[in-house]
Amino acid sequence: MAKGKRTFQPNNRRRARVHGFRLRMRNSGRAIVSGRRRKGRRALSA
């Protein structure tokens, strides 16, 4: 029986475009970043 491919295929450009800081600075993403700042997260976004 054939196995499917792995679901995580790393790609830095896609990672930045989907989860990056510039994206978080748009609209409601700001709330996410401010919450992570308040919590003291080392990384705010990808």
Curated annotation (Swiss-Prot):
PROSITE patterns per record: RIBOSOMAL_L34 (PS00784)
Keyword Signal attributed: no
Pfam families: Ribosomal_L34
GO MF, any single term: structural constituent of ribosome
Keyword Magnesium: no
InterPro entries xrefs: Ribosomal_bL34 (IPR000271), Ribosomal_bL34_CS (IPR020939)
UniProtKB keywords: Ribonucleoprotein, Ribosomal protein
Biological process (GO), any one: translation
Record field: transmembrane: none
One GO location term (cellular component): ribosome
HAMAP family linked to this entry: Ribosomal_bL34
Family listed: Belongs to the bacterial ribosomal protein bL34 family.
Protein name according to UniProt: Large ribosomal subunit protein bL34
Native source species: Mycobacterium avium
Gene of this entry: rpmH
